[in-house]
Amino acid sequence: MTSEAIEVLIVGGGQAGIAMSEHLTERGIRHVVLERERVAERWRSERWDSLVANGPAWHDRFPGMEIPGVAPDAFASKEQVADYLAAYADRIGAPIRTGVEVNSVRKREGANGFHVETNAGAYDARYVVAATGPFQLPSIPPIIPEAAGVTQLHSSAYRNPSQLPEGNVLVVGAGSSGVQIADELQRSGRQVYLAVGPHDRPPRSYRGRDFCWWLGVLGLWELNAPPAGAEHVTIAVSGAHGGRTVDFRELAAGGITLVGRANAYENGKVRFGADLAKNVEEGDANLFALLDAADAYVERNGIDLPEEPEARRLLPAPASMTNPLAELDLAEAGVSSIVWATGFRADYGWLQVDALDEHGRPRHQRGVSTEPGVYFLGLPWQSRRGSSFIWGVWHDAKYIADQISIQRGYLVNEPAPDSQPYASLRAGAARPSAVDADAVPGSAAPAPVTAQTTGTHA
């Protein structure tokens, strides 16, 4: 069976794959993007109906294009985000092939590059970029067995309250997804129990500026690693209902029963950790720390922004905090459904090269894999705190494109047998004038590494 030769093969047609395509196109590097479903599929079919972006439209976008029909300070719906990504891909002419699932990537025997098997044929690629991100498989802790007699689903499968059977609901996980789903269910008339773990809860806005702006001017988007001990702390922020600060005391005052982390299950009862008050109070402390930093920045720079003392006011601790539930009998409480907002795990089973650790996680430095020729894109904290955002992945993609350009420069004078698909990489091969995913890869001297432009958060 013949294989199609391509210089760079990108796996994944979401925001990371699109950003990667843009920067490779600018450098004249031939490539193809393989997407197993539609462009931005996860935004379209694996999120709840009312989801909006967690950041304002001026922030959660690519640098070169605004989100059509969305005011800069508004929060785009999931449909608007998906349509935006597809429109951006069209604008840059990204060579995306949809409906193509990558089954395996292996090193080529006796030759440079990688052999890629898909459901629509095979490829031989000089470089491979894994742009699928880490959110591939829903992660549900093995706590409550299926025999418990309640409906259990992951947040990626939740759509709206009417999807769930009649009865009360336990939501496990108090990050952005868990908080918004719990709030939606409570507003629909359900009695909701919300299991709260460690979290950060930044202000939605403070002194007239969104928290995304504050993280930018304070340099916090550029942190290259989470603070020690906070590696698994989730962030609770919401753009729902026009955007508001997540306040667990306020959620409790509205009728949601807060509980600690779900730890175990036995005889129809879910047991919770004795950590609820600690988790809520540490989230409050995180909020106040950012407010303090913002106030200091305003004073230090003489900026005229209105003071906002009400941002520091807390409601009294609810009864669920002062006298927390140690366990919940699901039947007695009328709980018929459990929504697990407990995140995802990566799935790189198709990447069959020496690029993963013993836990299946990428081994890399700023996306450059320990396997020469393989790159990762779209990882949280790939280079900085902002790497998970659209603008952040765009800058990470620029860096990866620069690295590929440098590596191509080393190969310009590489002797390559004419029988290999990379014969045109020899010295003197013409620089491609346009992206052509169907052509045998050409060659180019490495593109100059330009200074990184300012992110949209600054």
Regions found by a protein language model. Name each.
Residues 2-45, 75-432, 436, 446-458:
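Flavin (primarily FAD) cofactor-binding/catalytic cores of flavoenzymes
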Residues 40-64, 251:
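Redox-cofactor-proximal catalytic regions of oxidoreductases
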Residues 62-66, 378-380:
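A short small-residue
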Residues 68-72:
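A short acidic, helix-capping loop that chelates divalent metal ions and anchors anionic groups
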Residues 442-443:
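Long, low-complexity intrinsically disordered regions
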